[in-house]
């Protein structure tokens, strides 16, 4: 057993030795192989390094050659540029030399001319002195006297020219102002369309039949007397079929009588007690209508915040007329026109409309107020807390007080436009013709008047005067005298323009 173990140990030792020997040999071979590979790699690296070195040297030589070539080219370019500068400097120097020579020649020429001019000046001064002395001897005037005369003549000419220029500018300004005002007024009129109802002093009430006339008269005329007493209106019952005429200069009374009579006709019961009842109802109806008309006028014109009493006065204007023109419709139209013109001029439109609407409220009061309606209207507006501008526009629209605002001027202009519009106001044909004849008669009554023409429906009269009998100052005086005479002797709506024309003609012939 021990022998077996020993044999095993020996075998293991032999095997181990053999393995060691083989491993050592293999390691040796591996080392030799690695040494060969390293040697080959070293030689290869040397060859590559040598090749890289040669390439770097070649590249460096090429770069040096290129830099040298570029440097040589730059040097040549700089040298050429320097040569060009040198040539230009030489040329400029030559040019400056030539200019210097020319300047020297010109200076010599100028010096010669200066000497000649100085000699001429001395000669002129000598001649001037001789001529001045000769002129003084001939005219017997000293130089100061002649200078004074010349200055006076120049002053007269300048004064005349300045006067002509001022006159021309004034004429042009007036023409432009007239053109602008016409344009503003025309635009306002074109944008304002208002209707007018011409009122009369009578009203016709239709009857269902002629038997109703007897019932209206009543026994012994007591019904008609009662109605006339309560309303203050005259009832005219004549041969007109199926109609009764109410006559009164007070439109409100006439309207009360009309409403009461129509109610009685519809009711059929006509006696004094019933008449009194119907008249009371008619009065209330008219008062309500007055209030509604005043409110409607403020609504149409856009005027708000009026005192209730002012609104009532406006409503009463429906029953007032001026030369046949309804005063309420006229006031509404004036409000429109004043507002439109104010908008064109950039003024206070609301103020102009308010003053235009209220300008005739003085016509809405009864007889207890005395004085011009414009002044009364201004006092009423002040009483009911209207602004000072509105009060002034109302009081001044007929010239009773001085105008303080531009809106007041517009109200006056709008009032004149509304009144002067064709068809707005009327008068009888006979009175119209007589008024025109009287106008021309007044004009021709003055000495020196050649012809006179009443035009523009009697709102202007043109008077042709004889220039050899009436001078410019006389024409102005004649116009003023005619104005005074017309105001004293005639009654007319609106205003009348007096145009005195003096014409002088100078005729000659060119041959």
Curated annotation (Swiss-Prot):
Record-listed E.C. numbers: 3.1.-.-
KH domain: residues covered: 201-286
Record's keyword terms, sorted: Cell membrane, Endonuclease, Hydrolase, Membrane, Nuclease, RNA-binding, Transmembrane, Transmembrane helix
Pfam families recorded: HD, KH_1, RNase_Y_N
Compartments reported by the entry: Cell membrane
Protein's UniProt keywords contain Glycoprotein: no
GO CC field: plasma membrane
Topology of the protein relative to the lipid bilayer: Single-pass membrane protein
HD domain mapped to chain residues: 327-420
PANTHER family xrefs: RIBONUCLEASE Y
Family statement: Belongs to the RNase Y family.
Protein name: Ribonuclease Y
Gene responsible for this protein: rny
């Amino acid at each position: 057993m021990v022998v077996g173990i020993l044999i095993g140990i020996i075998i293991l030792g032999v095997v181990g030795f053999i393995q060691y020997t083989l491993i050592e040999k293999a390691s040796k071979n591996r080392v030799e192989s690695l040494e060969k590979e390293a040697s080959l790699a070293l030689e290869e690296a040397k060859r590559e390094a040598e090749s890289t070195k040669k390439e770097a040297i070649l590249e460096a030589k090429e770069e040096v050659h290129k830099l040298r070539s570029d440097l040589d080219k730059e040097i040549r370019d700089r040298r050429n540029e320097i040569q060009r500068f040198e040539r230009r400097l030489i040329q400029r120097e030559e040019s400056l030399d030539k200019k210097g020579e020319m300047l020297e020649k010109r200076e010599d020429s100028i010096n010669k001319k200066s000497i000649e001019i100085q000699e001429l000046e001395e000669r002129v001064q000598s001649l001037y002195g001789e001529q001045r002395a000769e002129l003084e001897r001939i005219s017997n005037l000293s130089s100061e006297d002649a200078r004074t005369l010349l200055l006076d003549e120049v002053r007269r000419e300048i004064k005349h020219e300045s006067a002509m220029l001022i006159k021309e500018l004034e004429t042009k300004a007036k023409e432009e102002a007239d053109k602008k005002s016409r344009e503003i007024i025309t635009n306002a009129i074109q944008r304002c369309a208002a209707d007018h109802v011409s009122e009369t002093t009578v009203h016709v009430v239709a009857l269902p039949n002629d038997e109703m006339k007897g019932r209206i008269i009543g026994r012994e005329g007591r019904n008609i007397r009662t109605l006339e007493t309560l309303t203050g209106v005259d009832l005219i019952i004549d041969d007109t079929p199926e109609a009764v005429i109410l006559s009164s200069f007070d439109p409100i009374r006439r309207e009360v009588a009309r409403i009461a009579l129509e109610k009685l006709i519809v009711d059929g019961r006509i006696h004094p007690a019933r008449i009194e009842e119907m008249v009371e109802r008619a009065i209330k109806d008219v008062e309500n209508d007055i209030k509604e008309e005043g409110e409607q006028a403020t609504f149409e014109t856009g005027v708000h915040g009026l005192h209730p009493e002012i609104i009532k006065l406006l409503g009463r204007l429906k029953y007032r007329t001026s030369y046949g023109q309804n005063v309420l419709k006229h006031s509404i139209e004036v409000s429109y026109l004043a507002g439109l013109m104010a908008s064109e001029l950039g003024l206070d439109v609301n103020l102009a409309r308010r003053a235009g609407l209220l300008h005739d409220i003085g016509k809405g009061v009864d007889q207890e107020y005395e004085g011009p309606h414009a002044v009364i209207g201004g006092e009423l507006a002040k009483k009911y807390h209207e602004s000072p501008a509105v009060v002034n526009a109302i009081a001044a629209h007929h010239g009773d007080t001085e105008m303080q605002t531009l809106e007041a001027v517009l109200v006056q202009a709008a009032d004149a436009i509304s009144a002067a519009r064709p068809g707005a106001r009327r008068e009888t044909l006979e009175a119209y013709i007589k008024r025109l004849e009287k106008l021309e008669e007044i004009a021709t009554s003055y000495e020196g008047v050649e012809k006179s023409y009443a035009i523009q429906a009697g709102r202007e009269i043109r008077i042709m005067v004889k220039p050899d009998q009436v001078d410019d100052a006389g024409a102005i005086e004649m116009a003023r005298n005619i104005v005074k005479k017309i105001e004293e002797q005639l009654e007319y709506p609106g205003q009348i323009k007096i145009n005195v024309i003096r014409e002088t003609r100078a005729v000659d012939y060119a041959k």
